[in-house]
């Protein structure tokens, strides 16, 4: 059992016969009245979003989630195909199932696919990926101010804020959990 006060992003639990994963949460402690937890939940099976508030002492049954590493193969524009390395079985996933991770995945990279009762519902990118910059504005010569960032597009199409010294063609390491630049590779 998990209590509402212990909910965090990524937790998966059962509520009213459905399985939800926590997309966002906020613990609210008003000056008057009881504390509560405001959550944004995604239905694991149909992808629907639901915003709900809970009393922090409410308890839920945790859902058993299977995690399997699979290789991202390709997209046909509508579906994204992943392959199990042991059975060579390919599974197609739609954009709603891959949206958080796909902006950091290149073809042939490995990702964690989450399953509930044999049904794939979510993709988790590796914590760190190395991608090449395909477009960014050139940094001004001599501009060495610290913590000044500029937008850069990487080879997967994601936009990441990078320091001024990063140029097109450079490879960088990105933390996929936050979408932030880590270092030049």
From Swiss-Prot:
Keyword Cytoplasm: yes
Function per UniProt: Involved in peptide bond synthesis. Stimulates efficient translation and peptide-bond synthesis on native or reconstituted 70S ribosomes in vitro. Probably functions indirectly by altering the affinity of the ribosome for aminoacyl-tRNA, thus increasing their reactivity as acceptors for peptidyl transferase.
Subcellular localization(s) per the UniProt record: Cytoplasm
Cysteines paired by S-S bonds: none
Biological or metabolic pathway of the protein: Protein biosynthesis; polypeptide chain elongation
TM spans (from-to): none
One annotated GO molecular function: translation elongation factor activity
GO cellular component, one term: cytoplasm
Stated name of the protein: Elongation factor P
Organism: Clostridium tetani (strain Massachusetts / E88)
SMART domains the UniProt entry points to: EFP, Elong-fact-P_C
InterPro entries documented for this protein: Elong-fact-P_C, NA-bd_OB-fold, Rib_uL2_dom2, Transl_elong_fac_P/YeiP, Transl_elong_KOW-like, Transl_elong_P/YeiP_cen, Transl_elong_P/YeiP_CS, Transl_elongation_fac_P
């Amino acid at each position: 059992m998990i209590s509402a006060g212990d909910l965090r992003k990524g937790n998966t639990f059962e509520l009213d016969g459905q399985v939800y994963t926590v997309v966002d949460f906020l613990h609210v402690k008003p000056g008057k009245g009881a504390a509560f937890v405001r959550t944004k939940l995604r239905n694991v099976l149909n992808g629907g979003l639901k915003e709900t508030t809970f009393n922090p002492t409410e308890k839920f049954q945790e859902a058993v989630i299977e995690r399997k590493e699979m290789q991202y193969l390709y997209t046909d524009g509508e579906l994204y195909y992943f392959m199990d390395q042991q059975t060579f079985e390919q599974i197609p996933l739609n954009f709603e199932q891959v949206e958080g991770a796909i902006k950091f995945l290149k073809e042939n990279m490995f990702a964690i696919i989450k399953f509930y009762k044999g049904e794939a519902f979510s993709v988790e990118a590796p914590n760190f990926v190395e991608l090449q910059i395909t477009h960014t504005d050139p940094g001004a010569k001599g501009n060495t101010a610290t913590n000044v960032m500029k937008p850069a597009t990487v080879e997967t199409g994601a936009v990441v804020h990078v320091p001024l010294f990063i140029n097109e063609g450079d490879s960088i390491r990105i933390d996929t959990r936050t979408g932030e630049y880590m270092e030049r590779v």
